[in-house]
Amino acid sequence: MHAIVAVKSLRSAKSRLAGELDADARADLVLAMLHDTLATVAAVSAIDTVTVVTPDPTVAALAYSVGVTVYADPAPHISLTNGASPRAEETLNAALSAAAADIRAKRGVVDLVVLQADLPAMQPSELTEAVAAARSGGRSVVVDHHGTGTSALFACGESALDPRFGPESARGHANSGARPLNGQWPGLRTDVDTHADLDTVRALGVGPATLASLTRLKATPSNSR
């Protein structure tokens, strides 16, 4: 299986945390959570390779430093036929589809999983179980802890990725035929967008890079892994 992880430009990342963290602090946290997410993915034997999709050179440098392939996100150069700028979810889904097509053009028919880049409490065992469940075939999703978003999207066999990320993505993926995967995977289901999400991952236990970032922010979590 090939994992795809998308990361937007650091200057616009985690805007919902802007009330508590300045731009530099948010960028530091994003990079730390990405580092821990990639480390967890690397610990899962069922995942052979990883691609980070990003337009950001700092994110790309981190990915290269841990031996991950980078696909240059074409989203910043995408425009609609009427000249308007596409919505964020449109550019994200276009970038993911382009990356998936590139991967399969080079590697043939491979199973794919798109993972959120901000899963600092995810455990290798959780992802291993989700991969095993997804391999029964077709498209499937791990719904996030809010019940509305998507933490992971799988496309196995010859199934197209067909990403529907954006508001209410869990519903969008379900309506397009993706089946929900059932499992007690709190770390896998908890991506970080808000201060409440940060509290949740603190309680679950975060990876070392995220712990260090939170410590720098003087918000040391009570638990770590």
Curated annotation (Swiss-Prot):
EC number annotated for this UniProt entry: 2.7.7.105
Uppermost EC category: transferase
Reactions accelerated catalytically: phosphoenolpyruvate + GTP + H(+) = enolpyruvoyl-2-diphospho-5'-guanosine + diphosphate
Region described as Disordered: spans on this chain: 167-186
Keyword list, A-Z: GTP-binding, Nucleotide-binding, Nucleotidyltransferase, Transferase
Coiled coil regions, renumbered to chain: none
Positions bound to phosphoenolpyruvate: 150, 166, 169
Superkingdom of the source species: Bacteria
Family (UniProt): Belongs to the CofC family.
Protein name: Phosphoenolpyruvate guanylyltransferase
Lineage, highest ranks first: Bacteria, Bacillati, Actinomycetota, Actinomycetes, Mycobacteriales
Encoding gene (name): fbiD
